[in-house]
Amino acid sequence: MNSALARRVEELQKFKSDFFGRVRELIKGRKEIRIVGDRFVFQSEVLFKVGSEELGIKGQEEMAKLAITLMDIEKSLPTDIDWILQIDGHTDNLPVKKGQDYLDNWELSTKRALSVLRFLIKQGIKPDRLSASGYGSFQPIDKKNTSIARAKNRRIEMKITQSTKTNQ
């Protein structure tokens, strides 16, 4: 049993490595999309208009490329490898303006992550391979109170990880 589990973990690692390698080629030389540790970081300005949860044209193009890469690599994976693409939305620390469609940054970050998730499903990614979370302004990557720091903190992060579903 342990050898089977070790094999699945090894295959998931290979999948992650292949995926990262292919996406790295897609984003080569682009500052607004980067790899940080085991995550892809897309700046919100690439994907969304300011204060909006809807993917813009450029955001749709980027997510379509990502979906094609993910589906292509998934074809070579054994079917018993349980993985998910975790999509995390983050905002800056400025409050949502009055009159906007969001109560707060928690809601905006969550709706942005869900917007990416739903777009990927429309592109053919299986829903059970996706998960979305919103963190509002509470996990900044730059804690300075400057416009540059706020721009860095407005982002979507994606990570391939092992699924937590259990076989019951």
Which residues does each predicted region cover?
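Periplasmic OmpA-like peptidoglycan-binding domain that tethers envelope proteins to the cell wall
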Residues: 2, 6, 13, 17, ...
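Short, charged, surface-exposed interaction patches
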Residues: 32, 36-46, 78-82, 89, ...
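Conserved helix-loop functional segments at active or binding sites
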Residues: 25, 29-32, 72-76, 122
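C-terminal targeting/interaction modules of large eukaryotic coiled-coil scaffolds and adaptor proteins
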Residues: 20, 24, 35-43, 168
